[in-house]
């Protein structure tokens, strides 16, 4: 894995506008950063990214299978007891999964380490699957990277294939909250993939969802919604006043309810419990287990429900705070994880996001930040394969 500087396309702003990339600049700061690129070899991708992703995903599914049968685990995950049975039903029925993203730290000379798995509401999808590929095509044409360079990126192909597998005569709704450019772009991109698969689809904001007679979900025209993709956390749905309606299983939500186990950072200590010493895992503990942290060991404290680095704190071996990100999750239960430093290139720390569609590892996106904690504003940097 090497990083090097490359020229920025002179008409980047226009290209972004033409492709609906409305957030390539966030708060007057660069988000999409194509002034540099990461180069990987095919062997690195296949052996160090793709293979571990596939193996870890299967391990995660084993955790789900154990968790739905174990009330102690569900309690540790802070999932409300009201939903235990319906989550187990969702898993036994093998309700559909669409996609997820594993976040890795990789220094290049040791196995990747899994930091967390967002299997419910992962973003940076549009950038990884679509806009990054446009950059690759332009970069090859202009000669700034080898003309035979490739990219670890079959995400869009797999998404379209997955929507073909999920095809139904009923409209597939796609929804997110209002006033979120990134979420809307992600959802519209997924809707486009569904349409390419031949699926009738409709967009609606979460705020515009209604309830009909008997508690059925409806759109603005009072049509009953039977299937919907939502870029809205499952734990928020469970805490909503209408959350108990999930137990009736009237609608098919994507992501499915069983994925609430995988999008929970409590997954990390469970993986360590069931697969201790695995080379791609970091030692991790629940709140009641933190006495197992070795004296002098640096560690990270994370809320079990947290997004975009919110309320993550890094401690050194003397329990001094090394870095902290503010957020809205300070009251959540915490997990503790052995600290794995991100590789540093210049002034930037680099995180690899490895994408999974259904059960298949299929692509990658790279984020950079000037701090050790990756956040929603962390820069997205393209990659390519050569050699």
Regions found by a protein language model. Name each.
Residues 1-387:
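Preference for protein termini
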């Amino acid at each position: 894995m090497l990083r090097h500087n490359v020229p920025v396309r002179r008409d980047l702003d226009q290209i972004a506008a033409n492709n609906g990339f409305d957030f390539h600049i966030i708060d007057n700061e660069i988000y999409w950063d194509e002034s540099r690129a990461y180069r990987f070899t095919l062997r690195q991708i296949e052996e160090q990214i793709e293979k571990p992703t596939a193996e870890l995903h299967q391990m995660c599914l084993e955790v789900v299978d154990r968790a739905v049968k174990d009330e102690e685990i569900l309690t540790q995950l802070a999932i409300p007891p009201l939903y235990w049975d319906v989550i187990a039903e969702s898993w036994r029925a093998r309700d559909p999964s669409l996609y997820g993203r594993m976040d890795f730290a990789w220094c290049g000379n040791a196995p990747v380490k899994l930091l967390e798995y967002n299997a419910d509401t992962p973003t940076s999808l549009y950038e990884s699957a679509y806009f990054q590929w446009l950059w690759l095509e332009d970069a090859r044409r202009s000669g700034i990277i080898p003309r035979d360079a490739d990219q670890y990126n079959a995400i869009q192909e797999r998404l379209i294939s997955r929507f073909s597998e999920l095809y139904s005569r009923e409209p597939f709704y796609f929804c997110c909250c209002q006033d979120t450019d990134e979420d809307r772009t992600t959802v519209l991109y997924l809707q486009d993939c569904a349409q390419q698969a031949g699926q009738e689809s409709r967009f609606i904001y979460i705020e515009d969802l209604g309830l009909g007679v008997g508690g059925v979900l409806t759109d603005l025209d009072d049509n009953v919604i039977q299937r919907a993709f939502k870029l809205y956390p499952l734990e928020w749905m469970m805490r909503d006043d209408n959350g108990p309606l999930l137990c009736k299983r009237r609608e098919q939500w994507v992501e499915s309810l069983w994925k609430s186990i995988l999008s929970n950072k409590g997954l990390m200590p469970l993986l360590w419990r069931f697969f201790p010493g695995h080379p791609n895992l970091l030692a991790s503990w629940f709140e009641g287990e933190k006495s197992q942290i070795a004296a002098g060991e640096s560690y990270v404290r994370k809320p079990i429900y947290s997004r975009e680095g919110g309320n993550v704190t890094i401690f050194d071996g003397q329990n001094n705070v090394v870095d902290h990100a503010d957020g809205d999750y300070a009251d959540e239960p915490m997990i503790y994880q052995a600290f794995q430093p991100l590789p540093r290139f210049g002034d930037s720390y680099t995180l690899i996001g490895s994408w999974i569609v259904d059960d298949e590892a299929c692509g990658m996106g790279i984020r950079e930040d000037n701090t050790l904690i990756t956040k929603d504003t962390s820069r997205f940097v393209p990659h390519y394969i050569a050699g």
